Amino acid sequence: MKKTTRRTAGGRGGAGSHELYQRVKKKAGTIKASSRRWLERHLNDPYVHQSKADGYRSRAAYKLIEINERYKILKKGQKIIDLGAAPGGWCQVAARLVESKDYNPSVVGIDYLHMEPLPGVAILEMDFFHEDAPQELISTLGSKPDVVLSDMAAPTTGHRQTDHLRTIALCEAAVHFSISVLKPGGHFLTKTFQGGAEGNLLATLKQNFKKVHHVKPPASRAESVELYLLALQFKGKTD
């Protein structure tokens, strides 16, 4: 199933942090200690508060903002594909920076999870691994992309190496997709987890892009094994 949407009323609101905190306090005795720690950290996170104030759907928006401030990968007039786009924070940032329009979106996001519509973003509600997904993305965008973004990550199990390997598999799929569709000179950004199994992934990126950077933006929590790989200046397909 797919869903293509080209307009929206805006970002997602939600209950205030104080109200949520009060609900958490009342239920503190019924949730696990690990879950309680996560909730407390979430409620005290300045990026969470800022995302609500700025109208972004997730704190992840600031990771892309910070990466872009350093590397300038998103510019006016570009075409963008966002893999694993839900809930839409990266799409919001990309649409703003490339000045995407509702009547002719230059940002396409795909996720099997439901996403509410966003201004200047076409949304495909389908699995990126569906055989029709690559063609649907290009058809919806109307041309090859200048940038492919991927914030995809497999659901975590709590076992670090397992989580690393599962996320690397998603990264590899995103890399092969980007190599098949990017314009020459285009860029690719993907999330990964540190763990030592990314050798082949890095080799593929270095073979196909002029520069590859490991990036950990300030918005990425210091204790997290999360890391971003940024591949710049796609060399072009070699048939």
Curated annotation (Swiss-Prot):
Chief place of localization: cytoplasm
Family: Belongs to the class I-like SAM-binding methyltransferase superfamily. RNA methyltransferase RlmE family.
Protein name: Ribosomal RNA large subunit methyltransferase E
Residues forming the catalytic site: K191 (proton acceptor)
Any single Pfam family the record assigns to this protein: FtsJ
Annotated HAMAP family: RNA_methyltr_E
Lineage per the UniProt record: Bacteria, Pseudomonadati, Pseudomonadota, Alphaproteobacteria, Hyphomicrobiales
Gene Ontology CC entries for this record: cytoplasm
Gene Ontology molecular functions: rRNA (uridine-2'-O-)-methyltransferase activity
Catalytic activity: uridine(2552) in 23S rRNA + S-adenosyl-L-methionine = 2'-O-methyluridine(2552) in 23S rRNA + S-adenosyl-L-homocysteine + H(+)
InterPro entries recorded: RNA_methyltr_RlmE, RNA_MeTrfase_FtsJ_dom, rRNA-MeTfrase_E, SAM-dependent_MTases_sf
Keyword field: Cytoplasm, Methyltransferase, rRNA processing, S-adenosyl-L-methionine, Transferase
Its job: Specifically methylates the uridine in position 2552 of 23S rRNA at the 2'-O position of the ribose in the fully assembled 50S ribosomal subunit.
Residue sites binding S-adenosyl-L-methionine per the record: G88, W90, D111, D127, D151
EC number: 2.1.1.166
Naturally occurring in which organism (per UniProt): Bartonella bacilliformis (strain ATCC 35685 / KC583 / Herrer 020/F12,63)
